[in-house]
Amino acid sequence: MYDVIPVVTERAVDCGPVCLKMLLANYDTEVDLETLITECNTRIVGCTGKDILRVGRLHGLDMKAFQMDAEELVNQDRPAIVWWMFKHFVVFCGKDENGQVVLCDPARGRYRMSPGLFKQYYSNVSFWNGDPEPLPVEDIATAADYEHALGELGVEV
């Protein structure tokens, strides 16, 4: 499990940039939150996954989006930004010594939950610095692929 430092915000629309700040900090890149909010084009409805990919790359990460199921994700050994409940971004930090999934949520801070509960809320899209191992079947490589994958999940983009 990675010890991602939680960042909490009072504005719900800032969840994407806040998660990106946590991920960047994990890779020793500090960027001011207000800068990320501006660069992600955060508006009244927040930002998009495409914004997270673009801004992460702007700050040196090899950001990629993948459609992977919860079982694949919880077995990864590094943090990722995940699309949560089809409306929110949180950071997946890994599993603890008891097998609980550890998340850093911009609205709640760090918390743990069972893998079963995680599966109920995880929206099957995750954002990584580089490729997760093993590589999931679906690499959402282009903006069109990303929009198509989210469309299949019932998310308007």
Regions found by a protein language model. Give the residues of each.
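Conserved active-site-adjacent core of cysteine acyl-enzyme catalytic domains
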Residues: M1-L150
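Polybasic/polar functional segments that serve as interface/processing modules
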Residues: A12, V155-V157
